Amino acid sequence: MDSSTATATTAPFIDHTDHVNLKIDNDSSESRRMGNYKPSIWNYDFLQSLAIHHNIVEEKHLKLAEKLKGQVMSMFGAPMEPLAKLELVDVVQRLGLNHQFETEIKEALFSVYKDGSNGWWFGHLHATSLRFRLLRQCGLFIPQDVFKTFQSKTDEFDMKLCDNIKGLLSLYEASFLGWKGENILDEAKAFATKYLKNAWENISQKWLAKRVKHALALPLHWRVPRIEARWFIEAYEQEENMNPTLLKLAKLDFNMVQSIHQKEIGELARWWVTTGLDKLAFARNNLLQSYMWSCAIASDPKFKLARETIVEIGSVLTVVDDAYDVYGSMDELDHYTYSVERWSCVEIDKLPNTLKLIFMSMFNKTNEVGLRVQHERGYNGIPTFIKAWVEQCKAYQKEARWYHGGHTPPLEEYSLNGLVSIGFPLLLITGYIAIAENEAALDKVHPLPDLLHYSSLLSRLINDMGTSPDEMARGDNLKSIHCYMNETGASEEVAREHIKGIIEENWKILNQCCFDQSQFQEPFITFNLNSVRGSHFFYEFGDGFGVTDSWTKVDMKSVLIDPIPLGEE
């Protein structure tokens, strides 16, 4: 978006100095709890304007991008050593260009996989680690035993490796692709983490020090690819072996995809303000956060249907969540859940106006999305949506009963319900409905398969680690940390370490699920991984979803609003 366009529209952020919460429910004198969420910092006039005033990519840039794409294809086709091929794939993926070169990447990785008999990587820590990570990442199994050559007879990693920072960093990143029970990778992670932490401040190469610091904050396997691409484009520009063709194409492609996303944001913002849900004082008004999450899950332009429907269902879901958490009485919530189970508006007149509005928004939007899927995909997804909504609201209902009854469940009971109440089974099923092969394939998501189970459980636990203090202050349902404290008598610090350990172990299980879930193909496997990565983005350092004026706004603005400067042609 150029400066004239930005001036003609409004600023992306809004000043809430004079903000007054609007209350829809004037027919009830009953005292209601409030979520105490601050109003959205995002200016909805600005967001709606993106439908027209999005970042238009100039024709000369489109032509240049096609030319550069051809040059990169030639790179893939040129003879090169296996390590060079892996490094090309790694850079292309981290720059966010993998959607442009899916075939070339698969062919390159499969050729490296087939070329494994001569052990060309043997004794080379960086090559062994990069090969392991990239091949496992794309579903080609490599055993952990490839790292035995770097261990002593006592199974400890060789201290000589500490001087090989690039190799240590590659080992560190590879270790997060481990499965449960892979002890060599556990040792690799501990070893690499310890010595990278000790060394990074003294690394002479600035680009390498920057990479190490970034990785220690959060490993690549746990990062949102689209956000990582924005960061890596800037970091890559400073690297000593930077390829200018790849860098230029990455900048152009990033802006081209961002333009598509901006247009979608504008159209979705127009829909959102017509629902009236943005005026509810007790609920989060988080359309752009919902879009960021859908973009985390499925940023590729070809997943427009999945992306938009995840935002629509997710935005309504957030308000339904807040209604169960802080607004409705137990009797009202029981009646709401009953109406969802029947999928009927017949008896919602018994509900207060606000809950009627929420129910009708949920009901109508779900049916609209079902109609769109029928039109664009040719099958009926509404029965699958209804099943997911019923399970969602029953999970909310159970949490509300715990709260109103003053009950603190054991951690296991909480977790089994919480992996549904977090909302990701519903959101991922929404994404799956948008990409399924046919209507019969929709049966695969009921009952919940392991892939969805573990990705949703991870999102629940990561969410709890970030939001528990805020939600406890509001008097909401207890979270996993507090369930464990109540069950065992542990301190909060000990409980947090325990939940952190569960998160790490469940990541290993999810990694293995990506190989074992043969009934699902790409891209749904990646959708699940990306949903957890989105949770790390929003909750790793607190509540970056509910608290809109947080560290996340900087990344959201750089990914969704601000194009990358292209400099001189």
UniProtKB/Swiss-Prot annotation:
Binds 3 Mg(2+) or Mn(2+) ions per subunit. It catalyses: (2E,6E)-farnesyl diphosphate = (1S,5S,6R)-alpha-bergamotene + diphosphate; (2E,6E)-farnesyl diphosphate = (+)-alpha-santalene + diphosphate; (2E,6E)-farnesyl diphosphate = (-)-beta-santalene + diphosphate. GO terms for molecular function: magnesium ion binding; terpene synthase activity. Its EC number is 4.2.3.82, 4.2.3.83, 4.2.3.81. The keyword Lyase applies. SUPFAM superfamilies: Terpenoid cyclases/Protein prenyltransferases, Terpenoid synthases. One of its GO terms (biological process) is diterpenoid biosynthetic process. It comes from the Eukaryota. Mg(2+) 1 binds at D321, D325. Mg(2+) 2 binds at D321, D325. InterPro entries: Isoprenoid_synthase_dom_sf, Terpene_cyclase-like_1_C, Terpene_cyclase_plant_C1, Terpene_synth_N, Terpene_synth_N_sf, Terpene_synthase-like, Terpene_synthase_metal-bd, Terpenoid_cyclase/PrenylTrfase. (2E)-geranyl diphosphate binds at R284, D321, D325, R460, N463. It is an enzyme of class 4 (lyase). Mg(2+) 3 binds at N463, T467, E471. A motif (DDXXD motif) lies at residues 321-325. The keyword S-adenosyl-L-methionine does not apply. Pfam families: Terpene_synth, Terpene_synth_C. Keywords: Lyase, Magnesium, Manganese, Metal-binding. Catalyzes a mixture of sesquiterpenoids from (2E,6E)-farnesyl diphosphate in fragrance biosynthesis. Catalyzes the formation of alpha-santalene, beta-santalene, epi-beta-santalene and exo-alpha-bergamotene, as well as traces of alpha-farnesene and beta-farnesene. The Asp-Asp-Xaa-Xaa-Asp/Glu (DDXXD/E) motif is important for the catalytic activity, presumably through binding to Mg(2+). This is Santalene synthase.
